[in-house]
Amino acid sequence: MTGEVGSEVNLEVNDLKLLSQEAADSPVDSGQGSFETLEPLSERDSDEEIFVSKKPKSRKVLQDSDSEAEDRDDAPEKPTYDDSAEDTQENLHSGKSQSRSFPKALADSDESDMEETPSQESPETQEAPSLEPGHQTGHSVDFTTGRKLSKTLLREGAEGKAKSKRRLEKEERTMEKIRRLKKKETRCEESDADRPLNDSGCLLEDSDLFETGLEEENDSALEDEESLESIRAAVKNKVKNRKKKEPTLESEAFSLEDGNELSKGSARKERKAARLSKEALKKLHSETQRLVRESALNLPYHMPESKTIHDFFKRKPRPTCQGSAMALLKSCKYQSGHYKETVNPADAAGMGAEDSSRGSEQRTGAGIAAETNVLSEVSEEAGITAGSDEACGKDPVRRGELEIEETEKHSDDRPYSPGDRSMSQQESSIPRIEDNEGHQAGDLTESDPPALEGEELKTVEKTDAKEGMPEQKTQSAAAAAVAVVTAAAAPPEKVRRFTVDRLRQLGVDVSSQPRLGADEDSFVILDEPKTNRELEALKQRFWRHANPAASPRACQTVNVNIIVKDLGTNGKEELKAEVVPVTLAAEKLEGASHAKPGEKLQMLKAKLQEAMKLRRLEERQKRQALFKLDNEDGFEEEEEEEEMTDESEEDGEEETTEYLLGSEDTETKDEKETDKENTDTSSDIGKSVALCVPKPLSSDSTLLLFKDSSSKMGYFPTEEKSETDEYLAKQSDKLDEDDSSSLLTKESSHNSSFELIGSTIPSYQPCNRQIGRGASFLPTAGFRSPSPGLFRGSLISSASKSSGKLSEPSLPVEDSQDLYTASPEPKTLFLGAGDFQFCLEDDTQSQLLDADGFLNIRNHRHRYQAVKPQLPLASMDENAMDANMDELLDLCTGQFTSQPEEKCQPRKNDKKENMEELLNLCSGKFPTQDASPVAPLGLRSQEKESSTEDPMEEALALCSGSFPTDREEEGEEEEFGDFQLVSKENGFASDEDEHSDSNDEELALDLEDDEEELLKQSEKMKRQMRLKKYLEDEAEVSGSDVGSEDEYDGEEIDEYEEDVIDEVLPSDEELESQIKKIHMKTMLDDDKRRLRLYQERYLADGDLHSDGPGRTRKFRWKHIDDTSQMDLFHRDSDDDQVEEQLDETEAKWRKERIEREQWLREQAQQGKIAADEEDIGDDSQFMMLAKKVTAKALQKNASHTVVVQESKSVLRNPFETIRPGGAHQLKTGSLLNQPKAVLQKLAALSDLNPSAPRNSRNFVFHTLSPTKAEAAKDSSKPQVRRRGLSSMMSPSPKRLKTNGSSPGPKRSIFRYLES
């Protein structure tokens, strides 16, 4: 056994050499240089310095190791090994691996906590069996597995206690020390290996960035490096292990002394091996440095590729093609994710060596993601192998046991991870590992590693030759090399794995990587997300598409069964079932989409057409009324027609008047009855017209216009009811048939039209109440403001008067006539007074309406009658609307006897008297003219008017609301505004007050609508008349009193006229300012004209316009002078006188100018002026003026005839070429600066026919009328002789022959100018 031990020692020494070489070579193999600093290899040329600096530490540790804990390593004592030679190698490996793994425990416990040490050591031993042949794998066993293994080792130690404790304790102490040293060395290598790993891009491994304290345990280990002392410790450890194992195998053949000898011998050989290894390491290092320098490989960290900014924002590319630094964390996610990441092109070349060495590991079937650096992988494998050697050497059974325990420990401490699988795979694939190592040498891409291997082999062989054991040395060299290289990185791997596993157990997500940018979910955004409008619109559109809107329900009639409580004949109450037809209005779904494309437009157009028809109808009637008012002839015709119609109706009317107006008491009763009847008839008419009439006319408020064709508006005695019904039906039918057709003139038609329009059209729209104005003298009279509510103030006169407040006519009688003279336009619109079909104008009616829907009567009146005060629109509109001559007559006459009694009386009067009264009223002869202004409201009084004053009084009484209910109506009107134009609703309301029994519900509805409309209308009307005051006064005057209308007429008229004047006429200040403006303008024009004349007369030619170069050229033509300008503004005969005066003055100065020019020409021919004017300056103008003045005086002395002849001769001989020596050709280009001859020619050419139209500017020549031509001829003779005189001084080539000059009549061309 001693020989065996000696051989083992030799092997160990040789192995130590190899190990030292391997330790030095391992960095070179990876091509990465020193682990510690990541510096270029050139900086680490001598490892000797490191060894020297580290030796003292390691020696010190060896010296102190004797006194240190001894109770930990019982496991090596187990007598389980049979083959001593095998055990030697295994012990060598295990000793190294254990010694390398111990520093880990030292970091934690610092030699005091020895339990950690075996636990850390044991993983290595556990992994070793699988990696024993020197297989390199990139995975180490988890730190946690060591704990269980340590327990098994403790069990083994307990078994070995049979041995002498002292010896074992001593051996254990040395073993512990050696292990600690080895572990420190491993730590050093591991820390060195860590740094190249930093290139993997995993920031978690960068201790500068993440000082988590997880790797603090490594700090102490960094201080120690691989040194010869550690190698010696490993040798001692193996020797001691051998000693421990031999007693078990050979029944304790060895004694303690043998062990001491062995230790001495091994110490000697250690020193020798240390020297050799040192030299070998130096050689190897220098050689590897040379190879690295010469190699063409671009190391990824040594020659970095230039990077763009994008590369900095990307994750750092992994230095290897497979896996990343996160593989250390055993993260499946990272392994799968980063496995595919490619390395930068520059890195790929440097990876060759690493890939090849790692490729061998992959071929072994490890199945785990390899480490990023070949070095780390190799060192890990070495450590695992070394650690496992010991266990394997002890016993194969033990090895299986360790494997099982390791697996259990893994499953206990952390979830089963790829690392666990890798361990089992590594163990099972041990036999293949050496083969793979052989492949490494053959790899073409790995040029450096093979060379290094050759170096290693050479050194190994040398040392083997010295020791005399070449074979054993070779084997041990291979195993030891693997062990040393692998041991460098295994412990750090384990540490990382352990910390990662601990983190996972604590619930920390290890896969997360730190980055500069914030995560999407790292911020809590409190702002509401912005809505995507386009998306919402798309949703809405899709919703509309998916859910088509329901089609609107059409108008339909439904029969509703109701139960009514009736009083039977016997006085008992009975419940009866009745069926009531209810018309459901068409549903208006505004949002509803119409089935057809243009359906909505068509519906709107149809509605508009209907509304326009009604509007046109009303406007037609208004125009007719206006037309008739304007043409008083129409009144007479209408009156005749009305008489004819009235004859049939008047009897009934008189009866009704007697019946209604006999007394106030009877009147109220009758009114109630008639209201009911009227409502019935109106409702019937409304039905016939297919228009819903909310309420038939109310007798009072509607001015009783409906009463009958007689002006008892709307009061229909029961006897007359049938008649009125017929008329109404007829009129309504006609309206339906033809909007443009004339409406029936009967009051019934009036009623129907009123209902029709009122019900259909909002009250603010004027309704053509007068359906057939000509024929419906009654309706007009009776229904004077057929749509009282519809017409704002205009109806007020008629409507409000019917209510009683407005009993006073809205217009004074005088004004009523003038009122309509203003608008002659309507005449053209009407086919005839009798015809009320104004179809031609239907389309244009809208233009004639104002914003409120009324005719633009006001505008016409302003245009034509600016002088007259405007009548309040109320009266205008009412009259226009009603257009019933009856109403108009009543209004004009102002005879509104608010007393029904009076009304009855007038009807009794003869028709002739009525006709006379009507004529008188139309003609403006109002017997009751003072009172008449109050009367305008009684529009319906056409029939009554046809009767004598009494019928007029009746009509006035009815219209004026002399009925007891007038007070109530007044109150209502005041509420609604300043006035209620008998809006039909208002009228109804008043009737309702009187006849609340008849139609309470209908009236309420109508009143609501009317109130709104009336308020709007009243606001507008306030501008034109102070109606509130007027209504109050009127109410006091006409009230419900039945006094005679004459009592109040005068006062009312005066008050009304004053109001109108105040409203219409501008204030005195305004008038004064306007007059001043006009006066000043005329004065200024006159001054300018005179100034111009003076300038032309006294300034030299051209001086008038020689002010500056920028002057405007002004040409004065004969007929486009002041006279033409005056024409533009003065069209009246008064202006003609002014024009004549202007013409005279103009003729004079023209005459004078021509004379001056002639004289100047004569002087020029004599050459006097030519010489002078060249020398003359501005001052010499006085001389020229003096000459002109003298010449003018001489010419004036000549007879007037001579002057005229001369001037005319000049004009008539425009072609004389008189050249005044060119002196007068001024430099400026103005026309007036031309030579006088040219000016004369122009004047002659432009001599126009004065009789021609004044403003005809487009033609120059006018033929003279024959008489004027003759006159011209006559005057030409004297001119010829005269011509001779003047031409003698300045002969012209075209001189006329001098015929005997017969003195012609004194005629001047200026006569034409004047005309």
Curated annotation (Swiss-Prot):
Modified residue Phosphoserine is at which positions?
A: 26, 42, 46, 53, 65, 67, 109, 112, 119, 220, 255, 522, 698, 701, 709, 722, 740, 785, 787, 810, 816, 823, 932, 990, 996, 998, 1133, 1265
Where do the record's region annotations for Acidic patch lie? 966-1063
Q: Where is the composition biased (Basic residues)?
A: 235-245
Q: What are the UniProt keywords, alphabetically?
A: Acetylation, Cell cycle, Coiled coil, DNA damage, DNA repair, DNA-binding, Nucleus, Phosphoprotein, Repeat, Ubl conjugation
Its main subcellular localisation, reduced to a broad class, is nucleus
Kindly list the cysteine pairs connected by disulfide bridges: none
UniProt feature, compositional bias: Polar residues: 91-101, 119-128
- Record's compositionally biased regions (Low complexity): 741-750
| GO aspect biological process, one term | mitotic DNA replication checkpoint signaling
Q: Where are the CKB motif repeats?
A: 887-896, 917-926, 954-963
A single GO cellular-component term on record: nucleus
- Report the GO molecular function annotations: anaphase-promoting complex binding; DNA secondary structure binding
Top-rank taxon of the source lineage equals Eukaryota
Instruction: Establish whether keyword Signal is in the entry.
Output: no
Extract the coiled-coil ranges from the record. 159-187, 599-626, 1001-1036
Known function: Required for checkpoint mediated cell cycle arrest in response to inhibition of DNA replication or to DNA damage induced by both ionizing and UV irradiation. Adapter protein which binds to BRCA1 and the checkpoint kinase CHEK1 and facilitates the ATR-dependent phosphorylation of both proteins. Also required to maintain normal rates of replication fork progression during unperturbed DNA replication. Binds directly to DNA, with particular affinity for branched or forked molecules and interacts with multiple protein components of the replisome such as the MCM2-7 complex and TIMELESS.
* The record's note on its domains: The C-terminus of the protein contains 3 potential CHEK1-binding motifs (CKB motifs). Potential phosphorylation sites within CKB motif 1 and CKB motif 2 are required for interaction with CHEK1. The acidic patch region is required for normal DNA replication. Interacts with the N-terminal segments and inhibits binding to DNA and PCNA. Mediates the interaction with the kinase CDC7 as well as some replisome factors and DNA polymerases.
Quaternary structure per UniProt?
Interacts (phosphorylation-dependent) with CHEK1; regulates CLSPN function in checkpoint for DNA damage and replication. Interacts with ATR and RAD9A and these interactions are slightly reduced during checkpoint activation. Interacts with BRCA1 and this interaction increases during checkpoint activation. Interacts with TIMELESS; the interaction is required for leading-strand replication. Associates with the MCM2-7 complex and other replisome factors. Interacts (via the acidic patch) with CDC7; the interaction is required for phosphorylation of MCM proteins and CLASPIN by CDC7.
What is the designated name of this protein?
Answer: Claspin
Biological source species: Mus musculus
Its lineage opens with: Eukaryota, Metazoa, Chordata, Craniata, Vertebrata
